[in-house]
Amino acid sequence: MFIEDVPTNSILIIAAHPDDEVLGVGGTIAKYTGMGVDVNISILADGATARYEDRMVTELQECALKAANILKVNEVYFEGLPDERLDQIPFIDVIKPIERRIAETKPYIVFVHHRGDANTDHQIIKLLLKQQSLLQGH
């Protein structure tokens, strides 16, 4: 499929952490929004890791919103899950916000982390989304 052949006006980006959406598919976001497609982003984890103080969460969210504004993103959702610990919480708590955003935005395409990504949070999101799509017959 070519990018110009998208038959719907909604795309969803699911990212583990603030900045993953821009680093992963920033150029693709710009292409789609430039075509008038509504791009929505769900950032699952809050960004509070050992390398950042809790106050950095607000700054990371502000930076994500600035980038989204530049890219003309429709909406950014911050789901507030624990950063670098998605493997330590029930998977249902990870999949619920994903399901909610898919139901709300009704995307034709969902972008998620690459299957070869080494980050544990990224791997979990990819695995859960793949399982969920198989269960729903996509």
Could you describe each region identified by the protein language model?
Residues 1-105, 131-135:
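Active-site rim/loop-helix segments in enzyme catalytic domains that contact anionic ligands
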Residues 97-138:
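Active-site adenylate/phosphate-handling loop in enzymes that bind or generate adenylated species
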